[in-house]
A protein has these predicted regions:
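Alpha-helical DNA-contacting segments of helix-turn-helix folds
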Residues: 14, 35-44, 51, 86, ...
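C-terminal effector-binding regulatory domain of bacterial HTH transcription factors
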Residues: 172-182
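Hydrophobic alpha-helical connector segments
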Residues: 39, 53-78, 135, 158
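Helix-turn-helix
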Residues: 1-35, 39
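Amphipathic alpha-helical packing segments from all-alpha helical-bundle domains
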Residues: 46-49, 95-119, 129-134, 156-159, ...
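Short coil/turn segments at alpha/beta junctions that flank glycine-rich nucleotide-binding fingerprints
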Residues: 4-8, 79, 121
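Amphipathic alpha-helical segments used for helix-helix packing
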Residues: 73-97, 108-115, 144-148
């Protein structure tokens, strides 16, 4: 219900009716709409973070970029309601997470992978969080676009996004500059 109508437009009465339970049961188990929403968001976050963590656990840097991109976009395709709840959330107090928390969690994990790779390649590891957040932001934005477009296939989109990310990372200068300043 949250995915279809949004947090604000969904009432406890509607949730109870849809679940074929009484309102007091919702209040007893979740404390109200905010508590239920928090459980839904936390469940979705746990699922998508686990999928991405599995995707980046092993493999070459390129494989990790490709697999994590495909894992997230597959989540968007296969769990549209969960993605909608996180992407078009509720008041910040309603959940312990939400899209911002998800992005930070995933970016931290990707940043750890980048930090190790940067150290091994002679790059400044302090820059790793910048690149991790940039990559996560790009993939998330494309995921939001895809929820409206529904084409091309998630696999096709993942190939293009991963190629852009990989080519950028592969040709990353050790000391980036702005062309306007040269």
């Amino acid at each position: 219900m949250f995915a279809k109508r949004g947090y604000e437009a969904t009432s406890v009465e509607e949730i109870a009716e849809h679940a074929n339970i009484s309102k007091p049961i919702i209040y007893e188990h979740f404390g109200g709409k905010e508590g239920l929403y928090a459980v839904v968001v936390d469940r979705e976050m746990e699922y998508v973070v686990r999928r991405i963590a599995e995707a980046i656990a092993t493999g070459s840097p390129r494989q990790r970029v490709e697999r994590s991109t495909l894992a997230f976009l597959t989540y968007v395709r296969d769990h549209p309601d969960g993605f909608a709840v996180m992407a078009h959330g509720a008041p910040a107090a309603a959940a312990t997470g939400g899209m911002s928390s998800l992005l930070n969690d995933v970016a931290e994990r990707v940043g750890d992978v980048f930090t190790a790779a940067f150290k091994g390649a002679g790059y400044d590891p302090k820059a790793a969080p910048i690149y991790a957040h940039a990559l996560i932001g790009m993939v998330t934005s494309v995921g939001q676009w895809w929820t409206e477009a529904h084409k091309p296939s998630v696999e096709e989109v993942a190939k293009h996004v991963a190629a852009l990310a990989w080519m950028g990372l592969r040709h990353l200068p050790k000391h980036p500059t702005l062309a306007a300043n040269t």
